[in-house]
Amino acid sequence: MGAEPRIRVSAVLQWRGRVLLCRHEKPGKEYWLLPGGGVNAGESLVDALQRELAEEIGIVGDEDELPVEGPVAIVDSISPERSFAAKHVVHIIFAGDLTGRSLEAVTSKDAAVRGHRLFDLAELQGIVVHPPIQRFLQRWRPGDPVVYLGALWAP
């Protein structure tokens, strides 16, 4: 394959029974991701997650840092051998509760993020999520043991 795996941290952020996703666009397609991003060399997973949450949804500062649980899941996204570009992303997923926070101030400093939306769990099957973890999002509850979801790829 040739490409070194990339580590991406993200968080299942729940608010009143719904989950917050970030909308991304590439030419000809739209998809949704859990808020998060890449881990820099020398950065802990939780520090990377807090930095990414600040960039993608505006949660910043020590007093505003979101307490997180986890990791709650791990997923491999490995592109098929026949795909144009070899890609392998290891997703390490944490969780947090947005209850008590105003979501009106959710803003992104990340140009790749085209918007945010809270989804009811039943809506998740009707959208493209990268990686395709809709079933996990519908079933996961705080306190569940960490789970390896396997190799999942969404074209």
Residue ranges and their predicted role:
Residues A11, R18-V19, D64, G96, ...:
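Intrinsic-disorder/low-complexity peptide segments enriched for small residues
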Residues G38, I74, S83, Q134-R135, ...:
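A generic alpha-helix propensity feature with a strong bias for hydrophobic helices
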Residues K29-W32, E104-P155:
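Nudix hydrolase/Nudix homology domain
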